């Protein structure tokens, strides 16, 4: 809600990221941005509470060191406004829309408030269409919906960020679509690496502009909780503008857990009583306000991929558990799989998607996915017997199932474009038809004669056959 702008108030109290401001006249509305100078920097405060008749409690979007009591503050009359449009592509902005990549001001098509209503039911589109990513394990077993929400679950260091980079790269190449990346409370080093990798891989041009495909909005680990709690909304606002222009946008959030974590810090600073495991009492409301805006309308779509850190690998923790309710597909990364050297370390039995239905993906795709899961599940149930008694005690049928399962496990790995510099093997984009054909053939036993090493880190099944011949020649 807009209020009369340019009213001035004075700071009465500063406690960390919380600043109390006293106004003589009309109080600024909740969620309004109010501004002050802190040294040479413009400091934005967001109104969070009204205390009594003349004081508001605000959350700072930057550090508050250097603020003094009695300092003058101006009400902008609006929520935080960020630049939107093609000019944001290839640029890095912070939570309040200021460029932080030292490439000059951001050319924009106007400013939009970061707080907005979700699209109404009549505006939303309900068509079900699959988004092909070129990553075999994803496309086959847990396909992504165009305009859907996807959760990437995994503990620390199992490859969430690399998978996100590969998705941005593949979607930019295959679909030519724009992406928006919101870095929420993650490592500054990773943010910097991502920016440079995008330039090196041709996703973005240095300094932005023509040829760039991805806008970056960062609020990193070292920022105050106010910035981390709002930066996802700033990124979403940029994505919403592209959607309203008729684009199919990809919106990446790394990491949605830090959004919850920052909300919990802000909540504690505002003196609210915590709920389960010390999280904010408004956890579900905060999550809903963000997630309900990520949707497909009749104009365009926002497909969102959210990395979700799982504290102590516990999926029942309130933060990941609240995210689950909003998702169309889950891609679960498993440490046990990454320890085998299989990347992407996606768990083929734990990952789910509402798109995996014969009515949406077709009968052949559905049956192949189920066959693959059946073989892998059988292998999983035999693992105890193998560990205790060894392979020799299995029946011939079970031995065959285990051999096929191990081939499938290895065939679910594939070299990534963004990891070429580390692995030395060129990345592979595998078409959906090739993926289905390859896995179906393995399940039907057409490649029982090939060694399992032939299936490791290849693209389509033809490459596995070539690799098998090469291995046989070397062995001879």
UniProtKB/Swiss-Prot annotation:
Entry-linked SMART domains: AAA
Keyword Translocase: yes
Alphabetized SUPFAM superfamilies for the sequence: C-terminal domain of alpha and beta subunits of F1 ATP synthase (SSF47917), N-terminal domain of alpha and beta subunits of F1 ATP synthase (SSF50615), P-loop containing nucleoside triphosphate hydrolases (SSF52540)
Catalytic activity annotation: ATP + H2O + 4 H(+)(in) = ADP + phosphate + 5 H(+)(out)
Alphabetized InterPro entries for the sequence: AAA+_ATPase (IPR003593), ATP-synt_VA_C (IPR055190), ATP_synth_F1_bsu (IPR005722), ATPase_a/bsu_AS (IPR020003), ATPase_alpha/beta_chains (IPR050053), ATPase_F1/V1/A1_a/bsu_N (IPR004100), ATPase_F1/V1/A1_a/bsu_N_sf (IPR036121), ATPase_F1/V1/A1_a/bsu_nucl-bd (IPR000194)
Keywords annotated in UniProt: ATP synthesis, ATP-binding, Cell inner membrane, Cell membrane, CF(1), Hydrogen ion transport, Ion transport, Membrane, Nucleotide-binding, Translocase, Transport
GO molecular function term, any single one: ATP hydrolysis activity
Binding-site list for ATP: 154-161
Membrane topology: Peripheral membrane protein
NCBIfam families xref list: atpD
Family: Belongs to the ATPase alpha/beta chains family.
Assembly and binders: F-type ATPases have 2 components, CF(1) - the catalytic core - and CF(0) - the membrane proton channel. CF(1) has five subunits: alpha(3), beta(3), gamma(1), delta(1), epsilon(1). CF(0) has four main subunits: a(1), b(1), b'(1) and c(9-12).
Protein name: ATP synthase subunit beta
Species name: Rhodopseudomonas palustris (strain HaA2)
């Amino acid at each position: 809600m807009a209020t009369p702008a340019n009213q001035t108030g004075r700071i009465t109290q500063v406690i960390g990221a919380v600043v109390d401001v006293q106004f003589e006249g009309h109080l600024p509305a909740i969620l309004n941005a109010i501004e002050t100078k802190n040294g040479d920097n413009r400091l934005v405060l967001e109104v969070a509470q009204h205390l009594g008749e003349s004081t508001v409690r605000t959350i700072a979007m930057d550090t508050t060191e250097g603020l003094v009591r009695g300092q003058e503050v101006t009400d902008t009359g609006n929520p935080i406004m960020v630049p939107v449009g093609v000019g944001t592509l290839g640029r890095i902005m912070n939570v309040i829309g200021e460029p932080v990549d030292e490439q000059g001001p951001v050319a924009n098509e106007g400013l939009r408030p970061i707080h907005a209503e979700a699209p109404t039911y009549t505006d939303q589109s309900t068509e079900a269409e699959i988004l092909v990513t070129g990553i075999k394990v994803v496309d086959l077993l847990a396909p992504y919906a165009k305009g859907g929400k996807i959760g990437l679950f995994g503990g620390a260091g199992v490859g969430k960020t690399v998978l996100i980079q590969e998705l941005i790269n593949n979607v930019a190449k295959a679909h030519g679509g724009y992406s928006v990346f919101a870095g929420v409370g993650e490592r500054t080093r990773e943010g910097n690496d991502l920016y440079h990798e995008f330039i090196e891989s041709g996703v973005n041009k240095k300094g932005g502009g023509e040829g760039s495909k991805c806008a970056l909005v960062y609020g990193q680990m070292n920022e105050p909780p106010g910035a981390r709690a709002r930066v996802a909304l700033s990124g979403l606002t940029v994505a919403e503008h592209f959607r309203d222009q008729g684009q199919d946008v990809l919106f990446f959030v790394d990491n949605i857990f830090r959004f919850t974590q920052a909300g919990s810090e802000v909540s504690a600073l505002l003196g609210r009583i915590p709920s389960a495991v010390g999280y904010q009492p408004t956890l579900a409301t905060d999550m809903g306000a963000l997630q309900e805006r990520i949707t497909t309308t009749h104009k365009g779509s926002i497909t969102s991929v959210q990395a979700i850190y799982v504290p102590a690998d516990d999926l029942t923790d309130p933060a990941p558990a609240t995210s689950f309710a909003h998702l169309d597909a889950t891609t679960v990364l498993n440490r046990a799989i990454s320890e085998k050297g299989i990347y992407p370390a996606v768990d083929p039995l734990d990952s789910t998607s509402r798109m995996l239905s014969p009515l949406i993906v077709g009968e052949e795709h559905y049956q192949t996915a189920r066959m693959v899961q059946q073989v892998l599940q059988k292998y999983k149930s035999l693992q105890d017997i193998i560990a205790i008694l060894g392979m020799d005690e299995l029946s011939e049928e079970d031995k065959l199932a285990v051999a096929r399962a191990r081939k499938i496990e290895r065939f679910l790995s594939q070299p990534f474009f963004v990891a070429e510099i580390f692995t030395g093997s060129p990345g592979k984009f595998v078409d959906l038809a090739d993926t289905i054909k390859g896995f179906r053939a393995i399940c039907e036993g057409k490649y029982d004669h090939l060694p399992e090493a032939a299936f490791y880190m290849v693209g389509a099944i033809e490459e596995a056959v070539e690799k098998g011949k090469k291995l046989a020649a070397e062995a001879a």
